[in-house]
């Protein structure tokens, strides 16, 4: 059985098919339930873009655990050449890239900014679950296509506003993506993105009543597959 664990902000720990994956590992975020010292086994690190609250401690974790960092091509080159990361996979929007025989990742568009290459989201596909991490993004109509093409079991969506979708926009995104379940992220980390996740829950229940909303606290675990 796999799991999804929220580490605060946009950071998640995912275990699928026995492999441990970190997404946007800003482990030093003020709401993080773990420390760098507690991360001893990591197989892959997915980074949606190079902002410090998403790239986080990816370099330190990769160097400590020998994990492979997966990112947009330009960021992967930077991490390898300038930061000394030994194992990188630089890809671009599309895919798939096979991480193992049972796990593959696709890269999706995101409406945001980034210095090293485009900002992106990720779809992680495995027999246990399909997870869509939208990255930092505004609302865009092709989220419907992402939902139709990849059929995610769980969507991880930013709701903080200011830099990303607000609760209202994120709830509309849920109606486009049509996942089995949704987890709000990227909120209440600093004042500009202060939001009430219950507003997101209420809006989602109105726009997409068949989608389960899991409002998690940092450290909470969601077992996969979704029952």
From Swiss-Prot:
Pfam families: Lactamase_B_2
Superkingdom of this protein's organism: Archaea
Claim: Hydrolase is one of the keywords in the record: yes
Residues forming coiled coils: none
MF-aspect GO terms: hydrolase activity
Family in the record: Belongs to the UPF0173 family.
Name of the protein described by the UniProt record: UPF0173 metal-dependent hydrolase Cmaq_1073
